Regions:
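Positively charged n-region of N-terminal signal peptides that target proteins for export
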Residues: 1-4
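Bacterial N-terminal signal peptides
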Residues: 6-15
């Protein structure tokens, strides 16, 4: 009986291991800066340190504003959790570049991007690494993370840019 299960394991594992692996992902044209496309701007915001929902944490965050943004018209908004990995113009995702290209082609509406990293608790010793709050923020059941965005981050962004309050104009990923 054990040989039977071992044979099944080998039968299903070997083809998977022998299958050719994908080469590294090649960025498509929408991930490349196009000289003819107006480029939005990425603003690194001051570290967020005054959270009432996640007290004691500090986090880095950025706002992307498309070139087509007009202050008199509410923009859609998309939040990127683990935002530091998505906001880099030369990184693996290049979201600001993709947004620039898709907005310019009319394939997506004018959308402000909020790129936010999970919080961390600073240490008293600068040599120590801060304790991450990522798992608590992203993996906990409940409404804390949604409330953090709706009650703290969106109002802060709305002090500078007009963003939609329509749920159909909001998205989150990461």
């Amino acid at each position: 009986m054990n040989r039977f299960f071992f044979a099944l394991l080998v039968l299903f594992t070997v083809p998977v291991l022998a299958a050719p692996q994908d080469d590294q992902y090649t960025l498509g044209p929408d991930s490349q800066i196009q000289k003819s496309v107006p480029q939005g701007k990425v603003i690194q915001m001051p570290a967020w340190t005054n959270s009432k929902i996640y007290p004691g944490t500090t986090r880095d965050w950025w706002i992307y504003v498309p070139a087509q943004y007009k202050a008199e018209q509410p923009a859609n908004v998309m939040v990127f959790c683990d935002g530091g990995g998505f906001v880099k113009l030369d990184g693996p995702f290049r979201v600001p570049v993709v947004f620039d290209n898709l907005i310019a082609k009319g394939q997506m509406p004018v959308t402000i991007g909020i790129f936010i990293n999970p919080g961390a608790f600073p240490t008293s010793n600068p040599k120590d690494k801060p304790r991450s709050n990522r798992s608590f923020e992203y993996d906990s059941l409940g409404d804390l993370h949604a409330r953090f965005l709706i009650e703290e981050i969106f109002p802060e962004v709305a002090k500078i840019y007009q963003i939609t309050s329509d749920p159909e104009g909001r998205a989150i990923c990461g």
